[in-house]
């Protein structure tokens, strides 16, 4: 589901750019820092957590509980496409906002506001949370209503007061 969406969004962004001016889109063939490329063209995260046994599945709580299993195995091209889409304003309803409009890299991927500003200057109900370590989470949004990153992604994308897009508009 996620890869289909990524591919569709990538094609939409690419076709929109191609309609404006001929351009060559190339995706990275190397992994980001902290990742290692496997023989199967997958980026694997390497961290200090790899050196310790996890207590996550052993029912042990408190400060000694390790992080949950991480999501690994994306190719360098998939990671780079995700990065390009994150900064692409074509995903918003009026093509003026990207994910990075509210999740500023220099602000810890948050916006530093009590309430975020969305499409047409509309005010969101809350501020954008930081995106640090999101790959380790098992629920998303302030009320934990989304159980995956894929499910979470549709929230701000389709919210009328955030990015204000629709599935039909994305495909048009």
Feature names for model-found ranges:
Residues 17-172:
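Periplasmic c-type cytochrome electron-transfer domains
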Residues 2-14:
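Bacterial N-terminal signal peptides
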């Amino acid at each position: 589901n996620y890869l289909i969406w990524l591919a569709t969004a990538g094609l939409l962004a690419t076709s929109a750019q191609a309609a404006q001016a001929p351009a060559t889109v190339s995706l990275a063939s190397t992994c980001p820092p902290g990742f290692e490329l496997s023989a199967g063209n997958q980026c694997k995260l390497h961290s200090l957590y790899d050196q310790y046994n996890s207590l996550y599945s052993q029912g042990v709580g408190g400060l000694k509980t390790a992080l949950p299993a991480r999501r690994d195995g994306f190719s360098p091209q998939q990671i780079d496409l995700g990065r390009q889409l994150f900064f692409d304003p074509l995903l918003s309803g009026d093509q003026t906002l990207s994910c990075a409009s509210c999740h500023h890299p220099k602000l810890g991927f948050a916006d530093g506001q009590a309430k975020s500003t969305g499409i047409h200057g509309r005010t969101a109900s809350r501020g954008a949370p930081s995106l640090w370590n999101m790959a380790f989470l098992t629920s998303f949004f302030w009320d934990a209503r989304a159980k995956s990153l894929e499910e979470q992604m549709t929230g701000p994308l389709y919210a009328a007061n955030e990015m204000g897009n629709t599935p039909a508009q994305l495909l048009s």
